[in-house]
């Protein structure tokens, strides 16, 4: 294992509901109510730190899982001895450029989360790579990934990417995380037929479109964007989780073919009526808080979801009713959690 006499890395846990939980390792899973990153907990590189010389780091040629987290590394070099490495984590360093990885042909996972990288480059030798995380960097474009045909998970969260492009060769891709960027249009995803999870929270997207080819998609998160209409989801027949909170949606519609939905998050929009979802019989979680629901009869739309367990309706006009919780319990007897509180029996 690579070792260096520095302080232990700080663990981060950002509550990130609906966003990708897998960027990076299992110990730093990220979730957030609206797809935004908590400024108090988000990772941050500290440019005033002086980079260390890689010569001071001891590398074990036999090591398969190499951990070089928070080591103040300024340049990728000296890793050619790690011919057996399957995973390398270089997160929370001071790296400005991806380079000197040509010898790591057996690498399966590369973690460059929270550095100062401006360009995706010099990855062509990593043809066995299955997971790449370059979140929390300074990327402006998706590029340089053509040879990574085996990549299943790609995390580019919190960069400065303006458009979805150059992903055509990633036909094995199952998870794509592009949250917290500058994307305005959903596009160029047609070739990603294996994609199962797509995260686009906290961008500048105005329309749900160009998703027709994603037949295997089970999770779609487009929270904190500028969407005003529920549309373009008719071909996503395998969708199980849909996160659309913090947009400008006014009408519940367009979900006729999404019969497998188990989680529907449409909180913090402009919806006045719960409608057009009585066919969602597999629904287990329904998030409708921070809207404009005022009619108790609307809950009839949820009665066919016999396994419904969680309902969020707080900060709607309904909540002003003194019998708020009791009426929800009577209308939806299967529910075990109302807003943030579990029901006591």
Curated annotation (Swiss-Prot):
Q: Where is the LRRCT domain?
A: 316-345
- LRR repeats located where? 62-83, 84-105, 106-127, 128-149, 150-171, 172-193, 194-215, 216-237, 238-259, 260-281, 282-303
Cellular component terms (Gene Ontology): cytoplasm; nucleus
SUPFAM superfamilies annotated for this entry? Answer: L domain-like
The family note in this entry says: Belongs to the SDS22 family.
Q: What name appears for this protein in its UniProt entry?
A: Protein phosphatase 1 regulatory subunit 7
Subcellular location, in the record's words? Nucleus
Region feature (Disordered): 1-53
Functionally, this protein is described as follows:
Regulatory subunit of protein phosphatase 1.
Compositionally biased spans, kind Basic and acidic residues = 13-30
Q: Which UniProt keywords apply?
A: Leucine-rich repeat, Nucleus, Repeat
- The protein's predominant localisation is nucleus
Pfam families assigned: LRR_9
